[in-house]
């Protein structure tokens, strides 16, 4: 059976390469719930369980650290996330010793939306990316965005200049 991270990486690459349907048709030995989480992230909580929890019932750090009491064991002892209560703070993910929790992944649904959208789509970025990604120039970033389906890129600072 494919691990969650393998399924995500392969599906993301297939989506980028416009081979998503072919990939899914040929997929075997996978967790259907994990695939549904990746294809339809809005139908699932902000935090996903990628495997069954095997922590002792009285020593689940993820449950203890959640300030919103959004993660809890169900009747069978498996972890559930209350979608309404979860704020996506990721404390539970950081505290999961077995690394069986992950944050919602929406890159695939964004790529699908870009491809099906009629009209122009621009990536709006903060100028802080220059300090965060030293080797990435605005030109490289713009090229990357256009390769995945955006029509262009605008820095949000441009709008601040226009409005002031």
Placement of each model-derived feature along the sequence:
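Iron-sulfur-associated redox domains of electron-transfer enzymes in respiratory
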Residues: 1-15, 20-22, 104-164
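Ferredoxin-type iron-sulfur electron-transfer modules and their immediate structural context
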Residues: 1-65, 69
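Short, glycine-/Ser/Thr-/acidic-enriched flexible segments
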Residues: 28-31, 42-45, 87, 128-130, ...
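Gly-rich Lys/Arg/Thr-decorated short loops/hinges at beta-loop-alpha junctions or inter-strand turns
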Residues: 41-47, 90-93, 122-125
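N-terminal juxtadomain amphipathic helix
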Residues: 44, 48, 52, 82-84, ...
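Charged, low-complexity surface patches
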Residues: 55, 85, 133-137
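Iron-sulfur cluster-binding cysteine motifs and their immediate structural context
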Residues: 57-82, 87, 91-107
């Amino acid at each position: 059976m494919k691990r969650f991270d393998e399924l995500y990486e392969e599906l993301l690459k297939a989506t980028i390469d416009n081979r998503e349907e072919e990939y899914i048709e040929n997929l075997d030995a996978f967790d259907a719930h994990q695939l549904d989480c990746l294809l339809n992230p809005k139908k699932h909580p902000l935090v996903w369980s990628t495997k069954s929890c095997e922590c002792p019932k009285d020593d689940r750090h993820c449950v203890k650290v959640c300030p919103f009491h959004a993660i809890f064991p169900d009747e069978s002892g498996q972890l559930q996330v209350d979608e309404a209560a979860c704020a996506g703070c990721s404390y539970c993910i950081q505290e999961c010793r077995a690394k069986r929790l992950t944050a919602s992944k929406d890159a695939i649904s964004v790529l699908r939306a870009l491809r099906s959208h009629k009209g122009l789509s621009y990536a709006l970025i903060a100028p802080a990316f220059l300090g965060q990604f030293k080797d990435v120039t605005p030109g490289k970033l713009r090229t990357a965005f256009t390769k995945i389906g955006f029509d262009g890129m605008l820095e949000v600072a441009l709008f601040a200049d226009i409005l002031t």
